[in-house]
């Protein structure tokens, strides 16, 4: 396994000269996420009495956000992650196109796989928070495996992810934690910095998956 610095350097080397398509994919993905979660935050404001809203409208907005996350954001997230994997492996820079192609090819399998992984994390979290977090890292490779192994069921992808992540969960946690400084800087730009941070992080995570796959 490479070091965090090596993953980040690999990501930056791949992105050099390819920031335009990476930013386009990032804008589209982040835009979709915000469009889906904004109604939820609007309901939050209403719940705290900061704005007035009818209970029925609050319920409808919550349903919209929940269904939007399940049926739109999650599968597009699968496509987004795999677009960057193909970018890191083969230099395919049509990231926006690859994102949607990956999301909607095998759409219901993507939806079911991510839902099932999230449901298992939820069940583990009912016991204690820490087991839920650990299981979340165990299932971290599911988005990649759903696309790379179409012959496997969603549950098989989850089990394979658990096996591949044995002894590597802290490595991924440490890699994610190494971006905390960039997250803080991005927040200071009212989120604009996320447009650059997201592709940088996704490319780094794809490089991590490449190593896990190679060593498994």
Kindly label every feature range from the protein language model.
Residues 1-216:
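Hydrophobic alpha-helical membrane segments
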């Amino acid at each position: 396994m490479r070091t965090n610095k090596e993953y980040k350097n690999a990501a930056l080397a791949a992105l050099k000269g390819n920031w335009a398509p990476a930013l386009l994919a990032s804008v589209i993905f982040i835009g979709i996420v915000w469009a889906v979660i904004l109604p939820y935050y609007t309901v939050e404001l209403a719940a705290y009495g900061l704005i007035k809203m009818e209970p029925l409208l609050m319920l409808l907005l919550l349903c919209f956000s929940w269904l939007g996350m399940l049926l739109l954001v999650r599968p597009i997230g699968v496509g987004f992650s795999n677009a960057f994997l193909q970018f890191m492996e083969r230099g395919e820079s049509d990231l926006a196109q690859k994102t949607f192609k990956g999301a909607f090819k095998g759409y219901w399998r993507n939806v079911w796989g991510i839902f099932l992984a999230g449901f298992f994390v939820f069940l583990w979290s009912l016991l204690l928070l820490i087991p839920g977090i650990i299981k979340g890292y165990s299932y971290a490779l599911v988005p990649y495996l759903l696309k790379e192994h179409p012959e496997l069921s969603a549950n098989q992808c989850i089990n394979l992810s658990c096996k591949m992540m044995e002894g590597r969960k802290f490595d991924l946690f440490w890699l994610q934690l190494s971006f905390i400084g960039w997250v803080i800087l991005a927040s200071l730009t009212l989120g604009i910095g996320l447009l650059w941070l997201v592709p940088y992080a996704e490319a780094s995570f794809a490089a991590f998956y490449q190593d896990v796959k190679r060593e498994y």
